[in-house]
């Protein structure tokens, strides 16, 4: 039987990030076109979760919240985890979100933020040599991401579709 009273549930808001050691859970809700990036160091039983909104900060002259952007938030999350004892060589990632929440009649790539977020997150993870183990991205439904730092598992609750483990 699992001792639930010792497990904390840490919330991550939109354009935010947080970390937790085992056996705690990190949860983010409201993943539409946004993407949740769960990074886990299995040797140190440490997890981090980032909820990004936009792919690239370079399009903006002033950045007030770096956690909004894939290109800034992911490296910040990794540095924060390293500061807590994690090693980037042990890190692996899982991602969810990146939905096309609006049905544009003009299928202009620039309007599909969800798809662009997915491309950017994968690019940043690759540049940082963090393997992407699994993903649940795309579609047109919102998601909740529940990251279990006990074993690195991630449950995705999709609107109208139940829960899926990635």
Curated annotation (Swiss-Prot):
Keywords in alphabetical order: Chemotaxis, Hydrolase
CDD domains: CheD
EC number(s) stated in the UniProt entry for this protein: 3.5.1.44
Keyword Hydrolase appears in the UniProt entry: yes
Family of this protein: Belongs to the CheD family.
HAMAP family: CheD (MF_01440)
Protein name, as recorded: Probable chemoreceptor glutamine deamidase CheD
Native organism: Clostridium acetobutylicum (strain ATCC 824 / DSM 792 / JCM 1419 / IAM 19013 / LMG 5710 / NBRC 13948 / NRRL B-527 / VKM B-1787 / 2291 / W)
């Amino acid at each position: 039987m699992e001792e639930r009273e010792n497990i904390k549930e840490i919330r991550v808001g939109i354009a935010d990030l947080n970390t937790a050691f085992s056996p705690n859970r990190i949860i983010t809700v409201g993943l539409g076109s946004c993407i949740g990036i769960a990074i886990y160091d299995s040797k140190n039983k440490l997890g981090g979760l980032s909820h990004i909104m936009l792919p690239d900060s370079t399009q903006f002259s002033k950045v007030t919240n770096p956690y909004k952007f894939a290109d800034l938030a992911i490296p910040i999350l990794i540095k924060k985890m390293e500061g807590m004892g994690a090693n980037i060589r042990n890190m692996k990632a899982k991602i969810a979100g990146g939905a096309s929440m609006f049905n544009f009649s003009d299928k202009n790539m620039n309007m599909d933020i969800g798809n662009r977020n997915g491309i950017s997150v994968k690019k940043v993870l690759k540049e940082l040599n963090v393997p992407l183990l699994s993903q649940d991205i795309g579609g047109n439904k919102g998601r909740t991401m529940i990251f279990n730092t006990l074993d690195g598992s991630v449950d995705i609750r999709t609107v109208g579709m139940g829960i899926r483990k990635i």
